[in-house]
Amino acid sequence: MALLTLLAKNATAIFICSTFASLLFYVVYQRYFHPLAKYPGPFLASITDLWQVYQYLTLKQPYTLTTLHEKYGPFVRYGPDKLSTTCESAVSIIYQKGGRNMPKTEFYDAYGAAHPNVFGMRNETLHSVRRRHMSHSFSISYVKEMEQYLDLNIAIMKEKLARYASTGEIFDLKKAFHYYVIDTLGELAFSQSFGVQVADDESLIPPVKEHSLLAAATGAWPAMLPQLKKWLPLVPYKPLRDLFQGRRACADLASRCVRERLLDLADVKDDEASLRLQRKDILTSLILAKHPDTGERLTEMDLETEAFGFM
């Protein structure tokens, strides 16, 4: 018994010492020998992604990163393997010349890796094809065609501002512009305003913030992302449940918009003259777009994921 007790104590001691030594080795490596060790940044950020998760959950991430750049300069290490830069010359290197050498990271998987849209798509080949599907929707000619719908929402906003000015009522200018942007995006993407400006009702805004916060916070911890996706929906914590509820609401709205638009186009002849008569919006352009090589159109699932991304 004495021998077993001694072995048990030694095993526990060995485990504790091994764990401590491993952690110490990891910290020393991250701080002094990692390829990003030469770049400045917070100590905790250099050893764990949980630092960034905390920044997102407390809604401080953009402000903290700005402060860090003011303190350290154009390059800041904000994660064990993450580097932030404000260097203008890096933009073309990363986004234009980087291409396949600098693909999107696992962070984007949090935005829907099971069936990703053009925003979260990490496969460069598929991403390139999808961008070609959508190219017309972001052309100058298309934007000019949509000016009438922009003008419509501008008129609503101008009328509200004029009313506030005549009555002397105090109002939130930032919120007024936010409402305008939301309704305009609805017109551009789905040919329908969300009616936020007219109703002056913030609850009509799609709960995009909830989805974005959930994706950012979980995507910031890529090593645990599969487990987080699996188990977080089961956690009985109301603020967390609210985030998942917001994500589901956005997905349901995207699906509904796609179904309604497909129904509207169901009886339209598939010829250039008939299609030209249809009201233009980003979703319709995507529905009618064909694969540049095969001529195939996107599936309903593809359309729903892209509509989800429009929000």
Explain the meaning of each model-derived region.
Residues A2-V129, K144, D151-K160, Y180, ...:
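N-terminal membrane-proximal hinge/A-helix region immediately C-terminal to the signal-anchor transmembrane segment
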Residues W51, F138, K290:
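Short, histidine-centered active-site or binding-site loop motifs used for metal coordination
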Residues K71, S137, L188-A189:
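Alpha-helical structural context
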Residues K104-Y111, E145-M311:
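Cytochrome P450 heme-thiolate monooxygenase catalytic core
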